[in-house]
A protein has these predicted regions:
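OB-fold (S1/OB) nucleic-acid-binding surfaces
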Residues: 99-105, 109-141
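N-terminal accessory interaction module
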Residues: 125-132, 150, 154, 165
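Eukaryotic non-catalytic protein-interaction modules, chiefly N-terminal intrinsically disordered
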Residues: 1-65
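OB-fold/S1-family single-stranded nucleic acid-binding modules
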Residues: 160-201
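Short nucleic-acid-contacting surface segments enriched for D/E, G, S/T with interspersed K/R
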Residues: 140-160
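Short boundary/loop segments of OB/S1/cold-shock single-stranded nucleic-acid-binding domains
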Residues: 53-107, 113
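Eukaryotic short linear interaction motifs
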Residues: 116-119, 132-135, 143-147, 165-168, ...
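Alpha-helical segment of the N-proximal tetratricopeptide repeat
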Residues: 202-229
Length: 229
């Protein structure tokens, strides 16, 4: 009888990469199609929050216990950034997106419905104006900033020429590799739909509220956040 041996960490990562490679290669056969068996809004958000609870924003697990992670970025079928003026782009919605395609000549307007998870990318669940939701992975952001300061719940943003693809885990998502392909909208930007504008909430805040928030962030050494307030 052969003695059973527990798989090593190297074995587990080899399996992960082989599985991801197979998923991404098979995804090419669905290029131009809409995703099937797409998760519901509740399923998207529940899975996102579950992963946040497992990994934690900084990758920890149990209090006082260190968890080492190997961060991976599997880039398959890379695409160039958008280089045309924004004014020439046509607005699209999530239902218009097709798998394994960078939607040239288009843009999509989204709003984050959860606080982000932090892997190699800043990962969130976002909705369009029709209430449809999708996973969004934004790469190459400033590593000195907390993910929540980049993409807090409620943040409205634009993705230019969105690249809609199958992720290495097998589900659909929008992948943003180029920092110039995402535009974060603030305050009263005219591109924000009226129903998404935080005008009433912001006007109701007193100047002391802004000051207190700024001081709190500064004391916590969250300097980017403090500067915003």
């Amino acid at each position: 009888m052969f003695r059973f041996e527990e798989p090593t960490v190297e074995d587990e990562w080899l399996y992960f990469f082989k599985r991801a490679e197979r998923i991404l290669k098979e995804a090419e056969a669905r290029k131009g199609q809409k995703p099937f068996n797409k998760p519901s809004r509740l399923q998207y958000i529940s899975q996102h929050n579950f992963l946040k609870g497992v990994a934690g924003e900084e990758g920890g697990s149990e209090p006082g216990k260190r968890t080492d992670r190997l961060l991976t970025n599997i880039a398959y079928n890379e695409h160039p950034p958008c280089i045309v003026p924004f004014a020439t782009l046509e607005k699209k919605f999530l239902d218009d997106l097709r798998l394994e395609m960078a939607h040239r000549g288009s843009y999509i307007l989204l709003r984050a419905v959860v606080d982000p998870n932090n892997y190699v990318s800043v990962t969130t669940i976002a909705e369009d104006e029709n209430g449809e939701v999708e996973l969004v992975e934004i790469y190459n952001q400033d590593g000195r900033r907390s993910p929540t300061s980049i993409m807090p719940e409620g943040q409205v943003f634009i993705v230019k020429e969105p690249y809609f693809k199958t992720t290495s885990h097998g589900g659909p998502g929008i992948r943003v590799d180029h920092v110039s392909d995402v535009i974060f909208l603030d305050g009263e930007d005219e591109r924000i739909p009226e129903k998404w504008r935080p005008r009433i909430r912001l006007l109701a805040r007193r100047s002391l509220d802004w000051k207190d928030d700024g001081n709190r962030f500064y004391k916590g050494k969250q300097y980017f956040e403090a500067a915003q307030w």
